[in-house]
Structure formats: C-alpha cells, structure tokens
C-alpha cells in the first residue's frame, strides 16, 4: 500500500508520543540521507506507522566497513497509531517483503538495522519476534546545569620514560602520536568485534591511521593519551560539534559533540584511568558550551554499560539488527 500521510493529526500524535517517551529525542525524526523505498501502514483511525528504507554500501577503504556490515538497510520508524506493537509489526513485515525483492539482501555481509528509541519499551517484543537483536546503543550525556565550568587543569610537563614513580599522566595527543592513536584504537575495534556489530577489516588499521592524522591535524585536538611510567595505557578521541554534524540529528539538543572511542589497557581497568580521560574530555566539552555529548557502545559489552552509566551517559537510541538483511521474520 502507499505510505500513509502523517500530515495534520498524525504527525502531532507521533510527536507527542515520542517526546513523552524521551524528551531528548529529535523531532521530526532524521530523514534517510540516501534514497530508499517509502513504507507505511494505516488503519481506520489514520496513519499507524511509516518509515523509509535506507540502502547503502560501506565505502571501501574508509572506516565505515568496520562499524557494521558491508551493505546495510536501515529503517527509522515513525509510529502515529495508538497500537505501537501492531503498527511496528506491520511496518516490519512490509519491510521484510520489500527486502525480499532486493538483489543481494540475503548475502552474508548484509544487515537490516532498525534505530529504535531506547526508552520505548512498546516496540521491544515486536522487534524480537521479527528476528532483530539489540546490538548497539547511542548514549547521551547532558552538560551539567551549574555555575561556569571549572578551568581546565594544566597538563603536567612530560616526564622521562622509566622514571618509575607509577604516576598516571594525561596529556593531549598531537600529530606525532597519530600512529600510536591508530594502534590503540584498533584494540577497541578488536574487542568490540566480539559483540556482533563491529568488524575488523583488512584495511581497518590503515583507515584508522588516516582518521587519526585528520583528527590530530588541527589545533588542540579533542584527543588525550594516558601514560604510566612513560608507557601509553589509555586513549580517548572525540569530535567537536562542527565535526559531529553527522550524528547531531539523532538528538534534540545542540550543540552536540561525539566521543569516538576510548581505550584502556586491560591491566589498568579499575585504576581510574578511564575516569581521568573522560573527566578531561568533559571539562573541555563543558567549557566549550557543548549541550550534549554522544557515544556508541556495544549493548553486550559487559564493561561499557556500567562504565558509561557511572559517567553520566544513558541510552538514547538502540540499534536492532538482523543478519543477513533477509533474516527479518
């Protein structure tokens, strides 16, 4: 059937419902940036659900193939009818039938992805019944509402390697650190690849080197290294709002920064190293007037979920995935 019209009352109902679920969600929902098929279901009461199937292939040689399947089909549903489970179920069934006619949707390195608000419990059972698994979370932290942010702590002077006092030092990463940043970053990808959404590809390290060089090329990059006795034990890298424009439409406040990744050496876990890195980033982001910071973590990562919760992040969107894309039930 043709996609229903959400004009007039349908859009208003959808907006009211969404903002009741989570006031940090954006409205209207992000449009698919690539062309795709419009989908929709309706009932006697008017529009129940609609979405647009976004098709795209990860760009070879970039970091994009490391963050998911080589070919992806994504849906961000808008639910306007009173029965969320029924509307979503009909939309997913229509999407399944659409993908069945798309050549290659059953190939191994494909995925069907639904972005669903994390606080919206009404769709969870429907997604599970249609063959989707919750794999990734986009989490959000809002800047504290208080007096002006405390000034940044001056960075300590470099110490000689091997001074042996065991002191943890956090410093800004600079261009000469680009290769080190890439080598630490790939450890994050290797660890997260255990949880189903992230993949190390043959050219991932080369792509990370290019990404690190670009990040560190500017003045005062948002990247920090933690060192103990002169040895690197941690890394945090983030994008300022002007570079985080690709993810900013997923949240209803601005400006938004994006925490790209954080690595802590396994021997350092529980020592406060990760907390020091996060505090450095938060102080700088808050001082710059950033309203919200966003990050992704793997839903099944037993370390990420409690760590980021302790540091003020909570789920905003959950990525549900069926692999291959034809696996939707």
Describe each region flagged by the PLM.
Residues 118-134, 275, 288, 299-317:
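Conserved active-site alpha-helix within GNAT-family acetyltransferase domains
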Residues 1-12, 169-184:
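A short beta-loop-alpha structural element at the N-terminal edge
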Residues 2-33, 192-211:
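Conserved GNAT-fold acetyl-CoA-binding loop/helix
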Residues 79-153, 164-165, 318-324:
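Acyl-donor-binding surface of acyltransferase catalytic domains
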Residues 53-58, 197-201, 205, 210, ...:
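A conserved beta-strand-loop-helix scaffold within acyl/acetyltransferase catalytic domains
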Residues 84-101, 261-264, 270-283, 287, ...:
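Conserved acetyl-CoA-binding loop-helix of GNAT-fold acetyltransferases
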Residues 26-98, 233-255:
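Conserved donor-binding loop and adjoining core beta-sheet/short helix segment
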Residues 114-115, 259, 293-297:
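Conserved hydrophobic beta-strand within the GNAT/NAT acetyltransferase core sheet
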